Amino acid sequence: MTQRHEDIAAVSFTGAVRTFGSVRAVDGVDLRIGRGETVALLGRNGAGKSTTIGMLLGLYPPDAGRVELFGTAPERAVRAGRVGAMPQDARPVPRVTVGELVGFVASRYPAPMPVARALELAGIAALAGRRVDRLSGGQVQRVRFAVALAGDPSLLVLDEPTAALDVEARQVFWESMRGYARRGHTVLFSTHYLEEADAFADRIVVMDRGRIVADGTGEELRRAAGGSLVAVDVAGRSPDGLALLPGVRSCEVRGGRARMRTDDSDATVIALAELGAIRGLEVTRASLDDAFLALTSSAGRPAGPGNRLSAPRDTAKAP
């Protein structure tokens, strides 16, 4: 049975594996990104993010499993101009202007975006006549964004797009990115900045040891890692048994203070009160940083349906 055009995902990984020598950089990844979604890819260094992006761009064919973009091989989608990429290690081209560079790249695609439009979306229309090798780091990063837009892609892939940018430059970049995403295109970006993922992405995919360990919204990740943190002073008394209190998923004792990650802070606090152990009581909502650390510190935790926090949303938007 032939799939309808709108049912075909922008990105599809099915049991994808990629090894480098004895290292399984990507280990059985299953991932579907619907058309029109914006998805953040998070993970520690070495988690497999860059290799996953390389497979998506056709740079690393899978050793096992399948990777498809819009229902076809990544290389075909890239050649057709359906994918724009902003790699982490791209270097500025010397002795050419911004307009010349973006225009040259656009000329290589069958149906490019008008150069003026790409420059406008990237927020660098005023820099069209400037030489690329004389721009600041933040300006060069926006030039890379314009280059990625040059083919008028349906999917934009960004590997650490705001790395090494200052706060102001990051804000300007994301304003430009929002303009692109509002046009209904699909965006996949990796980042070390959790607040960016939470603010901009529809979904956050967390990788660890080459596997997907969580996939959901920022709020769903917080709940999966334990919705709240309850802390009490335990100096002078035994912390034994705190990990067994109602709702508690984990307990860490450091410097005379116990920190409990709990799914039910009310039940945990009531149990502490019954024990007379509420000195220095503090209850806080788990942050995305807390969730990330919890999800990526579970040694050997396998990826699978049990770790998918919500079903991927396919917005069924045409490219």
Set out the residue ranges of the language-model regions.
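Alpha-helical elements of the RecA-like P-loop NTPase motor core of helicases
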Residues: A77, P94, D240, I270, ...
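ABC transporter nucleotide-binding domain
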Residues: V172-T262, E282
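Short, flexible helix/strand-to-coil boundary loops that buttress conserved ligand/catalytic motifs
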Residues: V78, A225, L295-T296
